[in-house]
């Protein structure tokens, strides 16, 4: 479906069931979940237990929407776990120890930051600035600079191939893209450079850095030494933006490093969270269980 974005006929609609980390289309989300449940449980004799990863800043209303949708799709129990916790578990971090761990998860719609210790979240923040906003920044830049309109999928490719927020000491990269000239309406080919994309992307990333600085200001002094030693764990597809680790290390003075499998860390951690169920329940308020009646 993603490859069809911007390429469909007028009678076909491509829908994002989830946007900014929350449900945007309940009916489509329910049908999607039913399809997934049928794949893992074709007989449908037993209802599954489902763990859903949600942004740290999710509201009670949004949580309830997630729960109701998953339950109506055929789940027996629904568990909600916050993204930074799932990311840490998926990256192999030991969240049960008393030392502080700081996690930055940059997904498609939201960026979540949390300091973890002893199975709990000490302090956290969530901003609606992530991979999708970076793509939008590239689209805006190309439109204002070259008077050419490119699609979201093209912007995403540009971001992955040459997007960067740190060009110091780095070789220039270029990529050729095609779009529609807004004056003539005709196709036009342009060449973009990694150097020219640094500032448009850095403007967006500043919001993440500000949120990270705010979280660090709230962190108890006892955990700061641990965090300085352990560094900052980065997960999510957006965390793979070139130079982001260098920029964060330079601005926040904490060594930032990418997880071994950043794209799948949250998904892996969400699955593994069932192994931590008893431990996470012990005073861990962000892990919630809802059962069908």
Region annotations inferred by a language model:
Residues 1-106, 114-232, 239-293:
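Nucleotide/phosphate-binding catalytic cleft detector across ATP-hydrolyzing
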């Amino acid at each position: 479906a993603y490859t069809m974005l911007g390429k469909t006929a007028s009678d076909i609609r491509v829908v994002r069931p989830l946007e900014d980390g929350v449900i945007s289309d309940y009916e489509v989300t329910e049908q999607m979940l039913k399809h997934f449940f049928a794949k893992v449980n074709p007989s449908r004799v037993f209802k599954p237990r489902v763990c859903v990863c949600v942004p740290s800043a999710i509201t009670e209303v949004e949580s309830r929407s997630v729960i109701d949708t998953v339950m109506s799709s055929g789940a027996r129990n629904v568990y909600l776990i916050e993204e930074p916790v799932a990311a840490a578990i998926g990256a192999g971090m030991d969240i049960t120890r008393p030392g502080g761990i700081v996690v930055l998860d940059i997904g498609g719609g939201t960026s979540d930051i949390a300091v973890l210790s002893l199975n709990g979240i000490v302090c956290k923040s969530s901003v609606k600035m992530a991979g999708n906003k970076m793509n939008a920044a590239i689209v805006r830049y190309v439109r204002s600079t070259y008077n050419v309109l490119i699609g979201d999928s093209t912007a995403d490719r540009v971001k992955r191939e040459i997007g960067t927020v740190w060009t110091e000491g780095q070789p220039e990269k270029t990529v050729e893209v095609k779009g529609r000239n807004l004056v003539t309406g005709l196709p036009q080919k342009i060449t973009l450079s990694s150097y020219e994309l640094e500032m448009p992307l850095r403007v967006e990333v500043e919001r993440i850095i500000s949120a990270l600085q705010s979280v660090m200001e709230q962190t108890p002094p006892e955990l700061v030494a641990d965090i300085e030693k352990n560094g900052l764990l980065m997960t999510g597809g957006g965390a793979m933006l070139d130079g982001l680790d260098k920029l964060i290390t330079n601005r926040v003075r904490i060594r930032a490093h990418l997880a071994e499998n950043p794209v799948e860390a949250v998904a892996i951690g969400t699955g593994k969270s069932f192994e931590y169920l008893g431990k996470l329940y012990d005073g861990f308020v962000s892990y919630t269980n809802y059962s069908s009646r």
